[in-house]
A protein has these predicted regions:
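Core catalytic lobe of class I
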Residues: 1-229, 234-238
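Short, conserved SAM-binding/catalytic segment
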Residues: 1-2, 240-255
């Protein structure tokens, strides 16, 4: 049986068989998209993957799987019955510069949400962005007020977060500040947001393609249990070092 708050090196399809039924609150993972020549970037068969997810997920649990096209279409169609919607992670800079003379650079990455039964859903507030605010005249009071596209008014100042999230999430990558561990690394803050949206403190999150361990780090920072799996020993070692660092940081905050 796989233990909580541990990471494992191996094939996730084999290791997940050691997990109990209905033991996971969230699967959050960034699997291989099959879009590069890297030896690890091979798409895992979807049928056995969903078979294990469906077995180990609790009722009302969620799977959030990142992707870009054409992988996004493949993963959605592999479980169309349980596909619900997409969060779009907006990057600071577009990618695909080598093809910029033939097609637009890509600035979004997808986070595909799957579930059977209505899950927990309490997304953290998102910061109010200037481009989403316009001037609005209230016909009853004849006075101007700030007005959001969601038609919720903002009182007096615009420094407050808005309560209804949009499906576009903007989080900077740690690679911009020198913390580059993996070629497809996602921001810790992005995964913290998704973890907080679909789980509560003490819940269990599985990442069967953990890479350099971003999901596990985000779990530690948000008070969730994690299980991480990856078949590449080098990245498992990187993940261990990152977890040691974040655990030591949390320990120092207590004293």
């Amino acid at each position: 049986m796989l233990e909580l708050n541990k990471i494992y090196c191996g094939d996730c399809l084999d290791l997940m068989r050691e997990m109990p039924d209905k033991s996971v609150d969230l699967v959050l993972t960034d699997p291989p998209y099959g879009t590069t020549v890297c030896k690890w970037d091979i798409i895992v068969p979807f049928d056995p993957l969903w078979q294990q997810f469906n077995r180990i997920l609790k009722p009302g649990a969620v799977s959030v799987i990142t992707g870009t096209q054409p992988f996004t279409s493949l993963i959605i169609n592999s479980n169309f019955e349980n596909f619900r919607y997409i969060w779009y992670w907006e990057k600071e800079k577009g990618v695909g510069f080598q093809n910029a003379n033939r097609q637009p650079m890509r600035i979004f990455e997808d986070c595909c949400v799957f579930y059977k039964n209505l899950p927990k859903y309490h997304p953290p507030k998102q910061p109010l962005r200037k481009r989403r605010i316009r001037r609005h005249t209230d016909s009853n009071t004849k006075s101007e007020s700030c007005h959001m596209e969601s038609r919720n008014y903002v009182n007096k100042t615009i420094k407050y977060d808005f309560e209804t999230p949009i499906n576009c999430l903007h989080f900077p990558r740690e690679t911009q500040i020198g913390e580059n561990y993996h070629p497809t690394q996602k921001p810790i803050a992005l995964f913290e947001y998704l973890i907080q949206t679909y789980t509560e403190i003490g819940d269990t999150v599985l990442d069967p393609f953990m890479g350099s361990g971003t999901t596990c780090v985000a779990c530690v920072k948000t008070g969730r249990n994690y299980i991480g799996i990856d078949k590449e020993p080098a990245y498992v070692e990187i993940a261990r070092k990152r977890l040691e660092k974040v655990n030591n940081t949390k320990l120092s905050e207590w004293f």
